[in-house]
Each structure stands twice: as structure tokens, then as C-alpha cells.
Amino acid sequence: HPLFYVVTDFSADMELTTAHIQFIKEHAADDLARLLLSAAKYPGMDIPFLVDQIAARRQIREKLPSWYENGQLIFPTKIAAEQCSSEQTAAYKQELIGESWTVCDLTGGLGIDSYFLSLKAKHLTYIERFPAYCEAAKHNFSVLGANNITVVNADTAQAVDTLPEVDAFYIDPARR
């Protein structure tokens, strides 16, 4: 077994269709418990998944306005949305790296910091141990046009010795 693998395919069960995006917009202010209880009214819709998306979007509305406005972005969990950096904080962190650096984010999470660092970096390697976070990050990076990011699903302690040389490591672990 390899110590890590590069995520190449996005899980189809996490994909947002045009109907999903519209549903999320239409129900953004709804009571989420009631929405879950009325799931039978929406055949063909994965209501638990969509409720999770609405809950996560509520978490990021103020701190990630550009991501909130982009209906194509996926959020793997509400906790990821709670713990992620704000756009303002991520932009500040971006100023701490040099132009054209290669960077490795050892604690990828939702990918906010990775995305902002990638706007300045030559290449960024995003490492995250949770597969769903990796799948969502790969999807979101693609939607955002961040083509200089490699997504790696691995435990950081195992993967770090196998990584190519980089100019900087970034680490901001979950605090829960």
C-alpha cells in the first residue's frame, strides 16, 4: 500500500447539479430540521447532503463571501466550514510567502489557505487525511481555476518524508 495517493477523481455522490444549486439558493433561509423532515417532498434530491451544504454555507457567509457567492463550491462538513480561515486571514497568510515558491499545506482542511497561497505560489501540495475533504478540495480548486495545486489524501506524518522539496511548509491543524 502506498503511504498516500493523489486524488484524481471526484466522488459522484458529492457533485452539485444545477438543480442542487437552485435548491440550496431557494432554501438558504429555511429551518433545516423541517427541511430534513420534509425530504419526501423532494424525490430525487439528496436532502441530507443539501441540508449540510446549506448549513456550511451559513457558516462561511461572512468570512468567505466570494466562496459563499459561488454556488458550484462544495463543503464536506459544517465543522470544516466553522474551522476554516476567513478570506482576510488567508490573504494575509499569502503575503508571508515569496513569489514563485513551492509550498506544502500539511493540514489542508477545506482548502481556503491552500487556495490563497496558490495564488502566489508556483505550486502548492495540499495534504489532508480525510478523503471527503480531499474530494471537495479538488473539486473546488478546479472550479476556482487553481490548476497549480496537487491534492494528496494522506496522513501528514506518513506523507511528509515522501514529498518533493518545497520552499515552505504551512500547518494550521484543527483545534477540535
Task: Report residues per predicted region.
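SAM-dependent transferase fold signal centered on methyltransferase-like domains
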Residues: H1-R176
